[in-house]
């Protein structure tokens, strides 16, 4: 990408739900504002996401500012849907690795592209997240890091005006089968 387009990233606001690794990648890429909505860190989360300290397991994930120039705002995942919608409003893209169904519905309501924990983008006026059979994805540190990296690349491409991978097309990362492009099926179709 051209330097102008990369510098322009500081003008964007992205919501990240439940993935500290995505937060780190986007912050280091120069995104201007990141609203990080955290959740409870399980033992599995701390094993899969290498940006989490295993001692942080069984706690809520709170992050602070990353630098004087960055605008990282941390929230706990709210119990109230109205509050979640308020936090998400005004963002340019929403990425969720937890609470995906609820977050996808709000993203559609507020007219923002939604990216789940696989490599694809759901546009507000396109295929709906909840209408597709969601693939079973094996989670381990390597496949998770590759998935997050590919998602960050897709976000940069989208913000630079290039076409991302749009649902129902998706990329899945599996250590046994490699990186593969798939077409997600609508629920109820064979």
Walk through the language-model features, giving the residues of each.
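Adenine nucleotide-associated cytosolic modules
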Residues: 1-190
